């Protein structure tokens, strides 16, 4: 559809500036990028993010705890997932399209194991449902990186410099999910807890804790409305009888 729109604008002879054509060209380029290319770009982007953050040492209590909780999930639901801890006072967790899930130490400090498992399940849901892929596609389409990547792509992969990767990561991690995406990811996390026979009440407790943080940034910036989400999970528990 985008290609047809570009062609019709070119042939009408109307007052179409080169800037408008460049923008439409960018839209077409972004739309033509494959999921596998975006996942590879996401992997590069996440590697840059790991380099910019303090990743917990494998022998630290945080890394050991996360590994204990997540080893069973590395191939969950046909996905290829990896998990790391960022040592940070920010309460946060996020996932990117390549299957990288990052949990911040401050979040781990405030959550029990079962509560943390729900948060992790929620993030896995964003990967499985394609929400993380949607985020990077939109961020890529709206960033200057699209020209840099198009100009330097080789062998089918998109190649970006560090500054472009950092800018793309910032856009991706700070973009809000829709209410439906959040609800679906919550439901996924809840189902995952039931699958492994974890205490589902911990999902409600986790969301209530996040809700008490208010709009203080971190996880609340991209995952809002935790209060109503807690009520929705409680309704699922009541429906299922446990």
Sequence positions of predicted segments:
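Bacterial N-terminal signal peptides that target proteins for export
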Residues: 1-2
């Amino acid at each position: 559809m985008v290609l047809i729109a570009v062609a019709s604008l070119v042939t009408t002879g109307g007052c179409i500036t080169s800037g408008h054509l460049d923008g439409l060209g960018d839209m077409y380029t972004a739309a033509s990028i494959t999921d596998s290319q975006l996942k590879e770009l996401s992997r590069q982007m996440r590697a840059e993010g790991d380099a910019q953050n303090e990743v917990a040492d494998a022998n630290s209590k945080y890394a050991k705890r996360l590994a204990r909780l997540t080893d069973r999930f590395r191939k969950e639901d046909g996905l290829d997932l990896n998990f790391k801890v960022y040592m940070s006072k920010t309460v946060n967790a996020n996932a990117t399209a390549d299957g990288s899930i990052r949990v911040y130490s401050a979040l781990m400090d405030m959550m029990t194991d079962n509560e943390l498992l729900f948060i992790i399940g929620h993030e896995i849901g964003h990967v499985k449902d394609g929400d993380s892929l949607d985020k990077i596609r939109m961020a890529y389409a709206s960033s200057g990186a699209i020209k840099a990547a198009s100009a330097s792509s080789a062998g089918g992969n998109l190649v970006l410099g560090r500054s472009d990767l950092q800018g793309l990561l910032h856009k991706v991690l700070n973009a809000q999910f829709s209410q439906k995406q959040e609800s679906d990811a919550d439901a996924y996390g809840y189902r995952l807890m039931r699958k492994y026979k974890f205490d589902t009440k911990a999902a409600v407790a986790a969301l209530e804790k996040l809700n008490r943080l208010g709009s203080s940034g971190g996880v609340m910036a991209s995952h809002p409305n935790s209060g109503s989400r807690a009520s929705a999970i409680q309704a699922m528990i009541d429906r299922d009888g446990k």
